[in-house]
Amino acid sequence: MSIGIFDSGVGGLTVFREIDREFPFADIYYLGDTARVPYGNKSKETIIRYSLECANYLYSFGIDALIVACNTASSYAIEALRESFDIPVIGVIKPGVELAVKTTKNGRIGVIGTQATIKSGSYRTEIEKKGDFTVYQKPCPLFVPLVEEGLIDHKITELTVKEYLDDIVSKGIDTLILGCTHYPLLKDVIKKIYPHLNIIDSSKATALYLKKKNLDLNGTGERKIFITDESPSFEKLKDLVVGSDIHLEKLELSKICTL
């Protein structure tokens, strides 16, 4: 049995890593749409089209579950994906929210993400369904390019984190949802600056959420990672996040656009 995972770039590898740990015998196929990263500044229509194209390619492997390892795509394209494919389609928003509301002690939850994810209000909507919580949101558009360029431990990243987060942290939040799958790669930087925060990694939450589905996902343990454009920074970060054993395979963008 097999799992398909897609994201606009390298961020979804944090989900791949957690799925790999929880389902060591499943076949896992990952598609990073590096030719069109980021999705966070695209229109809703474009995000849906890109998501359907990525999902359709992964579906051609006969996958049994699809993980939308992109918060932007989870915000805008999840319903279109569920209508288009006859397998479980799991986004990263609901699992992260469920963990956050269980974790917070004072009911003040911060959410950071791309412009598109924050604008969609997806996290606020899901959190408010769970009860009386106060939600503070902040778009952090520079985080994705910083991660994609491999500047995880750079001084400029620390300064950018403070510039974005000082305001919502000052509101008294005790829990922060990393509302983009790139952001767990900045978790150590964020924790260093704000050690008191409970940081919710939606990647791990999503893997645990899938585990609760009790799907028969035993296979041969095959692992494949595809990208739609050459990216030295992706390869470097892939080695950091999931190791160097898995070879990258480049797809021509036209191949997924015409399926």
From Swiss-Prot:
<feature type="binding site">
    <location>
        <begin position="181"/>
        <end position="182"/>
    </location>
    <ligand>
        <name>substrate</name>
    </ligand>
</feature>
<feature type="binding site">
    <location>
        <begin position="39"/>
        <end position="40"/>
    </location>
    <ligand>
        <name>substrate</name>
    </ligand>
</feature>
<feature type="active site" description="Proton donor/acceptor">
    <location>
        <position position="180"/>
    </location>
</feature>
<dbReference type="GO" id="GO:0009252">
    <property type="term" value="P:peptidoglycan biosynthetic process"/>
</dbReference>
<dbReference type="Pfam" id="PF01177">
    <property type="entry name" value="Asp_Glu_race"/>
</dbReference>
<dbReference type="GO" id="GO:0008360">
    <property type="term" value="P:regulation of cell shape"/>
</dbReference>
<comment type="similarity">
    <text>Belongs to the aspartate/glutamate racemases family.</text>
</comment>
<dbReference type="InterPro" id="IPR015942">
    <property type="entry name" value="Asp/Glu/hydantoin_racemase"/>
</dbReference>
<comment type="pathway">
    <text>Cell wall biogenesis; peptidoglycan biosynthesis.</text>
</comment>
<dbReference type="GO" id="GO:0071555">
    <property type="term" value="P:cell wall organization"/>
</dbReference>
<dbReference type="InterPro" id="IPR018187">
    <property type="entry name" value="Asp/Glu_racemase_AS_1"/>
</dbReference>
<feature type="active site" description="Proton donor/acceptor">
    <location>
        <position position="70"/>
    </location>
</feature>
<feature type="binding site">
    <location>
        <begin position="71"/>
        <end position="72"/>
    </location>
    <ligand>
        <name>substrate</name>
    </ligand>
</feature>
<feature type="binding site">
    <location>
        <begin position="7"/>
        <end position="8"/>
    </location>
    <ligand>
        <name>substrate</name>
    </ligand>
</feature>
<dbReference type="InterPro" id="IPR004391">
    <property type="entry name" value="Glu_race"/>
</dbReference>
<dbReference type="InterPro" id="IPR033134">
    <property type="entry name" value="Asp/Glu_racemase_AS_2"/>
</dbReference>
<keyword id="KW-0573">Peptidoglycan synthesis</keyword>
<dbReference type="GO" id="GO:0008881">
    <property type="term" value="F:glutamate racemase activity"/>
</dbReference>
<keyword id="KW-0133">Cell shape</keyword>
<comment type="function">
    <text>Provides the (R)-glutamate required for cell wall biosynthesis.</text>
</comment>
<keyword id="KW-0413">Isomerase</keyword>
<protein>
    <recommendedName>
        <fullName>Glutamate racemase</fullName>
        <ecNumber>5.1.1.3</ecNumber>
    </recommendedName>
</protein>
<keyword id="KW-0961">Cell wall biogenesis/degradation</keyword>
<dbReference type="InterPro" id="IPR001920">
    <property type="entry name" value="Asp/Glu_race"/>
</dbReference>
